[in-house]
Amino acid sequence: MVLIRVLANLLLLQLSHAQKSSELVVGGDECNINEHRSLVFLYNSSFGCGGTLINQEWVLSAAHCDMENMRIYLGWHNFSLPNMNQKRRVAKEKFFCLSSKNYTEWDKDIMLIKMNRPVTYSTHVAPLSLPSSPPSVGSVCRIMGWGAITSPNETYPDVPHCANINILNYTVCRAAHPWLPAQSRTLCAGILQGGIDTCKGDSGGPLICNGQIQGIVSWGDNPCAQPLKPGHYTNVFDYTDWIQSIIAGNTTATCPP
């Protein structure tokens, strides 16, 4: 238990210095301890990201969250209050849409991680289902993570924060970023009036709609939560066949074009 407390304190100390320029939950509230059982924290000595447990051996995250010496934390809620349900794993294998990891901000920002050994489900560790259909515009979805809760001057919580946002028409994101392609395998999601958003530290975490992981936190503007500047999420439904093929053992499966 002493070692766990030391680790927890180290995570808290370094988290504020360890974020890539990516995503967080601004404008949210502390997650209920029972609502984020699939939420995973990916971490090394340089930065942290989110992820989602999809079965006993596999975690889904963003390609730009790839890191050396990745450690995978499951069942965590409050970093300052360790509990016996917490698990730690390392990455055994990682899979990307392109072997070169030549993803872009608007396409193929997805990573599938096989852990070094399976986890046992518990009251604080459970998987999230892959999508059976894509979300519709207007759907209310849930975001969560240990990312910054203020922006641009970031502060980071020791517990994950959650918030609701809406699936928006992709044209809203193109209006905010005219350089985006006309079509993309991303979801545009947020609150048009601003105030709620993912932000630094939330990258790789889930966008949950109707109890399924529909999106992966990919990128957004800085400062976060600006009006008319929603976030961008990898559209998981478009990659479901690829994910299932990799898990089934077809490691040469290709992503959709």
From Swiss-Prot:
Localization per record: Secreted
GO cellular component: extracellular region; secretory granule
Superkingdom of origin organism: Eukaryota
Class of the enzyme per the UniProt entry, highest EC level: hydrolase
Hydrolase in keyword set: yes
Glycosites: N44, N78, N102, N153, N169, N250
Domain Peptidase S1 span(s) in chain numbering: 25-248
Maturation-removed propeptide residues: 19-24
Keywords: Disulfide bond, Fibrinogenolytic toxin, Glycoprotein, Hemostasis impairing toxin, Hydrolase, Protease, Secreted, Serine protease, Sialic acid, Signal, Toxin, Zymogen
Signal sequence residues: 1-18
Keyword Nucleotide-binding: no
Enzyme Commission number: 3.4.21.-
InterPro entries hit by this protein: Peptidase_S1_PA, Peptidase_S1_PA_chymotrypsin, Peptidase_S1A, Trypsin_dom, TRYPSIN_HIS, TRYPSIN_SER
A single BP term in Gene Ontology: proteolysis
GO molecular function, one term: toxin activity
Gene3D superfamilies named in the record: Trypsin-like serine proteases (2.40.10.10)
Disulfide bond sites: C31-C162, C49-C65, C97-C255, C141-C209, C173-C188, C199-C224
Pfam family, one: Trypsin
Tissue expression pattern: Expressed by the venom gland.
Stated regulation of activity: Inhibited by diisopropylfluorophosphate (DFP) and PMSF.
Family: Belongs to the peptidase S1 family. Snake venom subfamily.
Subunit structure: Monomer.
Entry function: Snake venom serine protease that has fibrinogenolytic activities by hydrolyzing the beta chain of fibrinogen (FGB). Typical arginine esterase which hydrolyzes esters and amides of arginine.
PANTHER family named among the record's database cross-references: KALLIKREIN-1 (PTHR24271:SF47), KALLIKREIN-RELATED (PTHR24271)
Protein name per its UniProtKB record: Beta-fibrinogenase
Taxonomic source organism: Macrovipera lebetinus
